[in-house]
Amino acid sequence: MNNPGVYKLFVYGSLRSGFKSHAYEYISRFFSFDGIGKVNGKLFDMGTYPAGVPAADAFIVGELYTIKNEPEFSWAIGQLDDYEGVSVVTDEIQLFRRDLVDVFTENATTIAWIFWYTGSVEGKPLIESGDLIQYLQQKK
């Protein structure tokens, strides 16, 4: 599921650099940081992870990355598909889907891959700022 020529990734949750998680360590080996960006969408607090869903009337703040070595992209993004629950086996529920999205940065608009949440966000708190790191800092 790769669109030839798209080697960028937009992340808004635990893959962001502010988390210093194992998942972030993984992507930092294969992807280089391009900068902060935003996409049209809404961000929800699911308790143990954030859920981004497409929406034209709001923005999600995150980080834009580009693969360091293009021939490794399919393998690297496949590993992230597994991490995000895109690739499932029988009787598992797919939590996220990978899709292309317009990313707005300070100087340009580009296309990147994003992991959108596929489940219900009904009754879950909306992260008004669209920025998970800011939201978690304010909750402290």
Residue spans for each PLM region:
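Glycine-aromatic micro-motifs
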Residues: 2-140
